[in-house]
């Protein structure tokens, strides 16, 4: 029996490989062109899109369990800050009214004490002036 064997020319193999490579490069180049076209179409509506639309689109990205956790955390933080603000307001009310009820009478008594001290000093100065004018004489207006 006779065996047939095909002898392949090396130049033919190289030419075929080169055409395959050229076809692949052409296909890749075509895909790049199509991809760049789709990239441009991705940016077409961005100028009309608002920040609210973008935030609403995040709803689709974030899973439900995470959204629930985030909402619960925000609610807890809001409640805590609200209670802290209420406590701060009530504390300021107590401190300010206490300062007024206790501080004003105290300041008035200090002022009265200062006036009394000033009056006593004036009396001593008058006595000293009388002693210089008439040594040993007593004044009828001021008791000794």
Swiss-Prot record:
- List keywords of the entry alphabetically: Membrane, Mitochondrion, Mitochondrion outer membrane, Protein transport, Receptor, Translocation, Transmembrane, Transmembrane helix, Transport
Q: What Gene Ontology molecular-function terms does this entry list?
A: ATP hydrolysis activity
Instruction: Give one Pfam family, short name only.
Output: Tom22
How far does the signal peptide extend, from start to end residue? Answer: none
- Cytoplasmic side of membrane: 1-91
- Any stretches that span the bilayer, and where are they? 92-110
Q: Function of this protein?
A: Central component of the receptor complex responsible for the recognition and translocation of cytosolically synthesized mitochondrial preproteins. Together with tom20 functions as the transit peptide receptor at the surface of the mitochondrion outer membrane and facilitates the movement of preproteins into the translocation pore. Docks tom20 and tom70 for interaction with the general tom40 import pore (GIP) complex. May regulate the TOM machinery organization, stability and channel gating.
User: In its UniProt entry, what is this protein called?
Assistant: Mitochondrial import receptor subunit tom22
Q: Which organism is it from?
A: Schizosaccharomyces pombe (strain 972 / ATCC 24843) (Fission yeast)
């Amino acid at each position: 029996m006779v065996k047939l064997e095909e002898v392949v020319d090396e130049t033919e193999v190289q030419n075929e490989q080169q055409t395959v490579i050229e076809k692949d490069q052409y296909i890749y180049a075509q895909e790049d062109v199509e991809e760049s076209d789709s990239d441009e179409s991705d940016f077409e509506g961005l100028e009309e899109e608002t920040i609210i639309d973008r935030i609403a689109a995040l709803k689709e990205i974030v899973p439900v369990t995470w959204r629930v956790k985030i909402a619960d955390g925000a609610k807890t933080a809001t409640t805590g800050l609200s209670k802290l603000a209420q406590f701060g307001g009530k504390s300021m009310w107590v401190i300010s009214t206490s300062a007024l009820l206790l501080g004003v009478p105290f300041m008035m008594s200090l002022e009265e004490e200062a006036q009394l001290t000033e009056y006593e000093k004036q009396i001593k100065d008058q006595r000293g002036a009388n002693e210089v004018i008439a040594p040993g004489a007593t004044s009828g207006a001021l008791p000794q």
